[in-house]
Amino acid sequence: MATVGFDKKQFFFDRQIVIDAVGRAGAKNLSKAGSFIRRSARSSLRRRKKVAPPGEPPSVHSQDRVATLKNIWFVFDPGQRSVVIGPLKLNGSKLQGSNRATVPSLHELGGTAVAGGRRKRKRRAKYARRPFMGPAMERELPKFAGLWANSVK
């Protein structure tokens, strides 16, 4: 599996490259849409010790400010001229297993991965589907039409 790396900060909505690509009004509206979805996804993730039931957003157990599911970013995608929203990919966040998926994607889509490390016994862990990004977008979708209503003057 190939990984493409880039500096995501160059695609923040206040950068000139983004404003030139979609215009000031388009950048502002895409930024608001990304912000709405990010806020909705973050608020659906609860910090607690218990495991969330399948079908509900996952519980967040980490106290770290960086290595957590709540660290959600949104950036401009110049290829699609759209906004990309999701949890930050951390180094070492890929799990062993057949599809080598990341923890956020396992929560969103469900699946299996090999859990354990160098000194721990390795075992297959089955993740139930606990979506949080898809439902956040569905909740915020009705607001999007109003964003572009009077954007071109």
Q: Locations of the language-model features?
A:
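Generic "edge-of-domain/loop-turn" microfeature
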Residues: F11, L90-G92, P142
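N-terminal, Lys/Arg- and Ser/Thr-rich interaction peptides
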Residues: M1-A21
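Lipid-handling modules and contact-site tethers
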Residues: A113-K153
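Generic alpha-helical secondary structure signal
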Residues: Q10, R15, S40, R65, ...
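N-terminal small/hydrophobic-rich alpha-helical segments that act as secretion/targeting modules
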Residues: R15, V22-A33, I37, M137, ...
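Short, low-complexity, charged/polar segments at coil/turn and helix-coil boundaries
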Residues: D20-R123
